[in-house]
């Protein structure tokens, strides 16, 4: 099981109930767990996703012990594991861009390879259809937050093989939109679409779609797909998270435009 967890970066775990995973984990001898430090990293991230922070921190201590005691780890791989541990710990600082970036920079300095515990084609937005809604945390600080995103994301991309690429661009586009700068928002939106083309960042593409929907209410723009076409495209990917995000944005659009009978 630990070999599978390590290889598929938590995809299998996401289909299981947290209680089931914890039950198996509690039955696994500590000595066996220590032989699979990459699996421990994946489990740490899953515990964060499941809001089980105490277990996440417990696994972190187990990982550090594994790195110290593992007889066959090279110094390079020890650095990679410690860096990836920093990366996963950064989630605990969500949504403080500066504090998250401190961990990303630390990880970037230690790592010589992309992270294994995070798949580059996995979700980046924790189910949110908006990067701005995720990371704008204080009134009056938006420009500062945008600059922080521009500075920190390259470090994150380096250690995750481009996971979430385009996040800073779509956040900038959303900022223009919220300030009523619709032309600038449209330009930045098209830049974001171009940036993510073909790179598998579906969660960022959905953020782009949500902004395109909102922009279409305020100015005459042509969306890339009809709602029906886009939903059909997402269904072909067999990922219910993407479909649910899209349905939520459609519900928002239809509510704002008074088409309540079309709300999914």
How would you name each of these model-derived features?
Residues 6-13, 48, 94, 136-138, ...:
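Specific register positions within alpha-helical solenoid repeats of the TPR/Sel1-like families, i.e.
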Residues 5-8, 25, 43, 89, ...:
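Hydrophobic core/packing positions within alpha-helical solenoid repeats
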Residues 13-16, 160, 200, 238:
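Short coil/turn residues that cap or connect secondary-structure elements
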Residues 182-264:
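Long, internal scaffold/assembly segments composed of regular secondary structure
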Residues 31-208:
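Internal alpha-solenoid helical repeat scaffolds
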Residues 1-48:
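Short, well-ordered secondary-structure microsegments
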